[in-house]
UniProtKB/Swiss-Prot annotation:
InterPro entries: Kinase-like_dom_sf (IPR011009), Non-receptor_tyrosine_kinases (IPR050198), Prot_kinase_dom (IPR000719), Protein_kinase_ATP_BS (IPR017441), Ser-Thr/Tyr_kinase_cat_dom (IPR001245), SH2 (IPR000980), SH2_dom_sf (IPR036860), SH3-like_dom_sf (IPR036028)
Lipid moiety-binding residues (N-myristoyl glycine): G2
Pfam families hit by this protein: PK_Tyr_Ser-Thr (PF07714), SH2 (PF00017), SH3_1 (PF00018)
Span of domain SH2: 150-247
Upper taxonomic lineage: Eukaryota, Metazoa, Chordata, Craniata, Vertebrata
Residues that bind ATP: L275, G276, Q277, G278, C279, F280, G281, E282, V283, K297
Gene Ontology CC terms: actin filament; caveola; cell junction; cell-cell junction; cytoplasm; cytoskeleton; cytosol; focal adhesion
Name of the protein: Proto-oncogene tyrosine-protein kinase Src
GO molecular function: ATP binding; BMP receptor binding; connexin binding; ephrin receptor binding; heme binding; integrin binding; kinase activity; non-membrane spanning protein tyrosine kinase activity
Residues the record lists as Phosphotyrosine modifications: Y186, Y418, Y529
Entry membrane topology: Lipid-anchor
Function as written in the Swiss-Prot or TrEMBL entry: Non-receptor protein tyrosine kinase which is activated following engagement of many different classes of cellular receptors including immune response receptors, integrins and other adhesion receptors, receptor protein tyrosine kinases, G protein-coupled receptors as well as cytokine receptors. Participates in signaling pathways that control a diverse spectrum of biological activities including gene transcription, immune response, cell adhesion, cell cycle progression, apoptosis, migration, and transformation.
Gene behind the chain: Src
Regulation: Phosphorylation by CSK at Tyr-529 inhibits kinase activity. Inhibitory phosphorylation at Tyr-529 is enhanced by heme. Further phosphorylation by CDK1 partially reactivates CSK-inactivated SRC and facilitates complete reactivation by protein tyrosine phosphatase PTPRC. Integrin engagement stimulates kinase activity. Phosphorylation by PTK2/FAK1 enhances kinase activity. Butein and pseudosubstrate-based peptide inhibitors like CIYKYYF act as inhibitors. Phosphorylation at Tyr-418 increases kinase activity.
Family assignment from sequence similarity: Belongs to the protein kinase superfamily. Tyr protein kinase family. SRC subfamily.
Length: 535
């Protein structure tokens, strides 16, 4: 298995006669195994075998981050617990970052000293006898299902497929997650391979008996999920393949750098490698407190009011979703520093234009767009507005993970050339006409920008409206001009772009719709897709 933390134990099975209630779905691979060259990624921080996807990108150019809320790439464990549970088990290794943190190893048992609220808990290690703060998303109650390595909790069907459809995963790689459709039920997701479909995923509903047991098919029942996993690890018994390996996943990011590390002193940061430069500042890879790799965005003095920034940052740090860059900490006096998690593949724009871009085909590009739509659907639910959605503000990590960065910052910029929405500093080619002309920025103007971003993806980073200057773009768009379908791009995807570019903002689709459309694109819209020279 990916690790030996929780190998399933042998179990006795209870067999009773009930009506058959088997629910099996096959999910075709959105990433056909033959399409993407694979290269082992760094195993650092992974719970299972190292993932693989595409050739290394060019030098990283920007910064990124991680968070967990609605859907998660790393398993989503339970939050604060009722019932007085105070003994927990570590799911991952953790190295202390401050003098008040507690280092621990995966599998270590920890006694919670204070109540289980917030992102950092005071804990006492039963192994070392030491006490300190721990990240709450790195532990789970002892002897609970959350402590099992194969339990991924509340992740979506699509996210489970994204994890399992890795060319390096052997047949039978699996995870257990909560069912999206049936409350109280679970789902066993298993990777499979056949010559017709290539790499694909099968999903089996795990139903619950009134007596508390579990079954996939009623002829074979179990007292616990642990027994079910142990049994199917030895016998396929109707599954596509016996369970072989726990699905590998990255160690999650902590919520914040440490307990009470929000407004931090400038001296605690070391700027090491300059990654990029823009109109309003620079982006660096650096270290916080001598212990933690971070990305640091430095803003030129005068870019925005420190007071307004701090107020907005309080809102931004509450936006928590795995497809949004989490804001870690700030230096709130000028020059303002914005600290986030470092993401090693840089900006999506550089990624598309770099060496990796030539290997990407439509399935990967559509999946990346679905991830961006997922992050923006969360922004939509939270009644927030991005204002500057484009490939340069999307960040890429291992396995083509995409996250939305720089949300909300554009509103605070005080540069006259920018606030007048004219000139080289303002991203006119990405901006909806009502926002560019009248300053009406809404989630619907973000939808327009998303349509432009889709052209960046399908052209591997080409500047929108090629050959046209900003003023010309504004005039032509007002007269009804819309970009034509990019070469090799299916008409169905261009039609989605045109929906995003409807003149009336309220007629544009929601991000919730865009996410669902793109996640199901190759089953519902383009099931006959065949790879071309570029897409």
């Amino acid at each position: 298995m990916g690790s030996n933390k929780s190998k399933p134990k042998d179990a006795s099975q209870r067999r009773r006669s009930l009506e058959p209630s088997e629910n099996v779905h096959g999910a075709g691979g959105a990433f056909p195994a033959s399409q993407t060259p694979s290269k082992p990624a760094s195993a650092d921080g992974h719970r299972g075998p190292s993932a693989a996807f595409v050739p290394p990108a060019a030098e990283p150019k920007l910064f990124g981050g991680f968070n967990s809320s609605d859907t998660v790439t790393s398993p989503q464990r339970a939050g604060p617990l009722a019932g007085g549970v105070t003994t927990f088990v570590a799911l991952y290794d953790y190295e202390s970052r401050t003098e008040t943190d507690l280092s621990f190893k995966k599998g270590e048992r920890l006694q919670i000293v204070n109540n289980t609220e917030g992102d950092w808990w005071l804990a006492h290690s039963l192994s070392t006898g030491q006490t300190g703060y721990i990240p709450s998303n790195y532990v789970a109650p002892s002897d609970s299902i959350q402590a099992e390595e194969w339990y991924f909790g509340k992740i979506t069907r699509r996210e489970s497929e994204r994890l399992l459809l890795n060319a390096e995963n052997p047949r039978g790689t699996f995870l257990v997650r909560e069912s999206e459709t049936t409350k109280g039920a679970y789902c066993l997701s298993v990777s499979d391979f056949d010559n017709a479909k290539g790499l694909n995923v099968k999903h089996y509903k795990i139903r619950k008996l009134d007596s508390g047991g579990f079954y996939i098919t009623s002829r074979t029942q179990f007292n616990s999920l642990q027994q079910l996993v142990a049994y199917y690890s030895k016998h396929a018994d109707g599954l596509c393949h016996r369970l072989t390996t726990v699905c590998p996943t990255s160690k999650p990011q902590t919520q914040g750098l440490a307990k009470d590390a929000w407004e931090i002193p400038r001296e605690s940061l070391r700027l090491e490698v300059k990654l990029g430069q823009g109109c309003f500042g620079e982006v660096w890879m650096g270290t916080w407190n001598g212990t933690t790799r971070v990305a640091i965005k430095t803003l030129k003095p005068g870019t925005m009011s420190p007071e307004a920034f701090l107020q907005e940052a309080q809102v931004m740090k509450k936006l928590r979703h795995e497809k949004l860059v989490q804001l870690y900490a700030v230096v709130s006096e000028e020059p303002i520093y914005i600290v986030t998690e470092y993401m090693n593949k840089g900006s999506l724009l550089d990624f598309l234009k770099g060496e990796t871009g030539k290997y990407l085909r439509l399935p990967q590009l559509v999946d990346m767009s679905a991830q961006i739509a997922s992050g923006m659907a969360y922004v939509e639910r939270m009644n927030y507005v991005h204002r500057d959605l484009r490939a340069a503000n999307i960040l890429v990590g291992e396995n083509l993970v995409c996250k939305v960065a720089d949300f909300g910052l554009a509103r605070l910029i005080e540069d006259n050339e920018y606030t007048a929405r004219q000139g080289a500093k303002f991203p006119i080619k990405w901006t909806a006409p009502e926002a560019a002309l009248y300053g009406r920025f809404t989630i619907k103007s973000d939808v327009w920008s998303f349509g432009i971003l889709l052209t960046e993806l399908t052209t591997k980073g080409r500047v929108p409206y090629p050959g046209m200057v900003n003023r010309e773009v504004l005039d032509q768009v007002e007269r009804g001009y819309r970009m034509p379908c990019p070469p090799e791009c299916p008409e169905s995807l261009h039609d989605l772009m045109c929906q995003c570019w409807r003149k009336e903002p309220e007629e544009r689709p929601t991000f919730e719709y865009l996410q669902a459309f793109l996640e199901d694109y190759f089953t519902s819209t383009e099931p006959q897709y065949q790879p071309g020279e570029n897409l």
